[in-house]
Structures are given as C-alpha cells and as structure tokens.
C-alpha cells in the first residue's frame, strides 16, 4: 500500500511538471510573433505559378502577419491557401480580388478595427489581436520617384540631395500620410504600432559615418526615414543589425547595373513590444531562392524583410 501511494505521488508530480513545461512553452510561443513585409510584384502574376510560389515562400517563413504590397487581386488566393485572415486596404465595398488594389494584410490572428485613410493606395491598416493584445498594423507603399541608382555620383552636396529627395511624388506622399502616423504614433503607450512595406527610399541609417567611404564621403540624413525616426518609430532591421557594412539588408538589386539598396522596411513603436531578430531575403526575379533548403522560383523584383517581436 505504501509503495502504491509513493508511485501515485510520483506520477502526480511528473504530471505537474509536464503541465508546467507545457504552460511555459505555450506562453513563450504566444509571447512572440513574426512579421513579414513583401512587395510581390504585380500580384505575382508575371511568372508561371507565381501566386503558388508566394504561398510556398510565406509557408517557409511562417510569419504571424504579412504586410503585402502590389496585391492586385491575388490576395484571396494567397490567404485561402495559407489559411490566414485577409484584410484588403481599400473601401469596404471593394471586391477582395479587385485587380487595382495595392496593399493588404494577412494574419494568423483575429482582426480588430479597420484603420482607413484617405490614401489607401499607399497607407492603411488594421488592428490585430495577438494573444489578446491589440497591435495596429500598417501596410505601406511610396512612389519610387525621385530615384537614382547611385545618388553619391550625382555631384550634389548633402543639402542638394535632401532637396532633390523632396522634388517628386515620394515626399508629397509622406507628407499626406504623416498626420495618420503622428496620430497613431502618439497612442503607442497603450496600443503599439507596426508599419511596414515598400518605401522605395534609402535610409539615413545606411548613409552614416560607417558607410561614407562607399558614398563619396557623404553622410545623408534622408528625409523619408528620418521623419519616421523623429516620430519615435524604430527601424527593426537596422536595430537588430546595426552594422550596415556587414549587414546591408539589400532588398532591391539589378543584375545589369550597380543598384543594390535597402528600400523595404518594418518600423515599430510601442512600450509593450520589442524586436528580437530581423532578416532580409533577396533573389532576382524568376530565379531560385533557397529557404529552409527548399528551392522556389522567385516571383518578385523586391526582397522582403522578416522581423521577430516579443511582448515585454
């Protein structure tokens, strides 16, 4: 009888240990989440099986949230194939497979309130509840103009480059959406925000003293990213990879000319979240990319960024 009770207590203790370990694993899992930002190029319709390859790539990355650019009607297929919730950044009456709609958001987690703007082609968002905690997510695209493959070779001073940057569509777009970013950025003590996508801009974080020898001795505080930093938003990739020499984070390249740049980003702000890791992935259009040992033909001309976060 004594041995019976001893064995019973041992089993109970082992069961308790198992429950504790299981609870710890579940809490650790739900306390972290992964975000991916990707411009898939024309809805991934420019190569055979392009949408299917987008799905395969996202499955290998396994993000909790995807901030997508150039959706162009492919969203429902991608979301249904992944089993993700899907939010199209457009007016509510817009068909989910509308071929003219640019931005979208995908999530493993439930959606909250929509975040509509007057400029849905280049900014919009939605609340997402991760482990019951609300985060505001924004997908973004800015125009590429003005653009130069090598601004350091334009013969301009720093001041002239900053004025050149303001000369066309991109700067005007940023100014239009700035009130939204200020509004939601001011509320991040209670509701954090994550902003990501294709900004089509160089970063002042990549044009500092460490890289000036690469840039004709120019240190350029590019307006587009500096504006976000001034709002308190953190460039997650550069935070986790502070050396732009060893980790350039290239997401835009061209085989025919010297045009390698980091132009796709995930920014964040909030007291309750912090980034823990960030990676960039890059391949050329219609060429293989290797993820987790699997070869997939790449459907886009942009690389993508993946950042892991945790709740504090």
Residue ranges, per PLM feature:
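A long, amphipathic alpha-helix that forms part
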Residues: 163-189
């Amino acid at each position: 009888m004594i041995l019976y009770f001893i064995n019973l207590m041992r089993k109970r203790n082992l069961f308790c240990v198992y429950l504790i370990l299981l609870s710890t694993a579940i809490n650790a899992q739900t306390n972290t989440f992964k975000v991916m930002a990707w411009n898939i190029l024309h809805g991934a319709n420019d190569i055979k099986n392009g949408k299917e390859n987008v799905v395969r790539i996202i499955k290998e990355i396994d993000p909790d949230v995807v901030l997508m650019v150039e959706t162009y009607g492919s969203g429902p297929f991608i979301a249904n194939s992944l089993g993700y919730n899907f939010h199209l950044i457009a007016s509510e009456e817009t068909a989910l497979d509308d071929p003219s709609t640019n931005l979208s958001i995908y999530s493993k987690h439930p959606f909250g309130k929509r975040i509509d703007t007057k400029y849905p082609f280049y900014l919009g968002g939605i609340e997402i509840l991760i482990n019951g905690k609300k985060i505001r997510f924004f997908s973004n695209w800015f125009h590429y103009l003005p653009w130069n493959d090598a601004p350091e070779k334009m013969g301009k001073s720093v001041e002239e480059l900053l004025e050149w940057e303001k000369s066309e569509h991109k700067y005007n777009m940023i100014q239009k959406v700035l009130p939204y970013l200020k509004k939601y950025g001011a509320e991040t003590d209670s509701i954090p925000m994550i902003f990501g996508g294709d900004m089509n801009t160089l970063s002042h974080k990549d044009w500092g003293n460490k890289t000036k020898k690469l840039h004709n001795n120019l240190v350029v505080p590019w307006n587009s990213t500096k504006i976000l930093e001034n709002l308190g938003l953190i460039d997650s990739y550069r935070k986790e990879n502070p050396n732009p020499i060893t980790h350039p984070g290239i997401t835009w390249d061209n085989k025919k000319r010297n045009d390698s740049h980091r132009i796709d980003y995930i920014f964040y702000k909030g007291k309750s979240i912090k980034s823990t890791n960030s990676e960039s992935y890059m391949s050329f259009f219609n060429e293989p990319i290797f993820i987790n040992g699997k070869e997939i033909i790449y459907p886009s001309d942009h690389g993508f960024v993946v950042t892991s976060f945790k709740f504090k």
